[in-house]
Each structure stands twice: as structure tokens, then as C-alpha cells.
């Protein structure tokens, strides 16, 4: 279904709502961290087929050998912009928000090894669009997001740990 784009509408990103949350809570999203070389490709799992695995909270200090984001290479189109992939990330610095602490944020981006991530391409997907806020945009454990046109399904099956050891499967 269609929705609307809100400029600077990613409440949990540094370029979003920095007035409500403290600076230690807000982090750039994983695609932008990657574009800035703050999150290297070896900490991002890129998939274009079936995959089941774990990602850790990307708003903590990165530990070598862990994955902090999932890039689903689907080359989808949204709002007339093509060549977009889905990005999935988990955040732990919002412990009172179960949509983040127990789930995943999903967005589209054109970030790829040969591209720069631009504002026009980054879209946070609200998994609960019936509410007026994106504070519940996350996909909680047990929920799934399906892209029927690209035949993709993203599902959070479990969550565990806390702080720097917080993860989702």
C-alpha cells in the first residue's frame, strides 16, 4: 500500500527527532554509518536469497566478527526511485520502546559498494502505519513484513541480550 514521505521523519536517527531523545540514544542508520565507513561491509550481512541469522544492536560499540545490519538486495522501487535495497537494523538504546528494543527497523536505501547513500533514497518503513507516529515503526518479534512484488518476507523470530549484547534473529 502507499504511504507518505516525511522529511527528517526517522525519529531515532541523528537527522530525525533529536529534540525528544538524548544524543547518546540517536545514531545514524546503518546505511549511513556504512557510507561514512563507520560500519564496514564485513559487519553487514548482504543477502539475495533465503537467510536466517542474528544481528546485534547497531547503536552500540561495534565488535569485530558480529553483524549489525542486514541488507536485502532486492533492487526494488519506491516513490519512483529504483535500485533500492531493504536494510534491517536493531537498536537497543530505547529500552522502553518494545518496537525497537525487541524488534527491527526496516528501511530502503540505495547504499551499495559503488553508490553514496542520499536523502532521497532513504525511507524508514512504518510497520504500524495506522498510528500517527513512527515511534512504533519497528517490526517486533513474531511479526513479518512481506514485499509481494519481490517475493521477500522479513520476520523477526527472537530477541535476546541487552545493551551491547542485544540481538535479534
Which role fits each region the language model picked out?
Residues 1-97:
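Extracellular hydrolytic enzyme modules, especially secreted metalloproteases
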Residues 54-169:
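Extracellular low-complexity, Gly/Ser/Thr-rich intrinsically disordered linkers
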Amino acid at each position: 500500500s502507499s504511504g507518505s514521505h516525511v522529511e527528517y521523519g526517522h525519529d531515532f536517527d541523528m537527522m530525525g527527532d533529536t529534540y525528544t531523545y538524548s544524543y547518546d540514544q540517536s545514531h545514524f542508520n546503518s546505511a549511513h554509518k556504512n557510507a561514512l565507513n563507520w560500519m564496514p561491509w564485513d559487519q553487514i550481512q548482504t543477502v539475495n536469497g533465503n537467510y536466517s541469522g542474528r544481528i546485534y544492536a547497531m547503536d552500540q560499540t561495534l565488535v569485530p566478527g558480529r553483524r549489525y545490519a542486514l541488507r536485502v538486495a532486492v533492487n526494488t522501487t519506491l516513490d519512483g526511485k529504483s535500485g533500492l535495497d531493504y536494510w534491517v537494523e536493531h537498536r537497543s538504546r530505547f529500552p522502553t520502546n518494545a518496537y525497537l528494543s525487541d524488534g527491527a527497523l526496516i528501511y530502503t536505501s540505495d547504499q551499495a559498494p559503488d553508490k553514496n547513500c542520499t536523502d532521497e533514497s532513504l525511507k524508514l518503513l512504518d510497520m504500524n502505519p495506522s498510528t500517527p507516529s513512527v515511534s512504533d515503526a519497528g517490526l517486533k518479534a513474531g511479526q513479518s513484513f512481506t514485499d509481494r512484488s519481490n517475493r521477500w518476507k522479513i520476520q523477526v523470530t527472537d530477541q535476546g541480550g541487552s545493551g551491547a549484547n542485544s540481538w535479534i534473529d
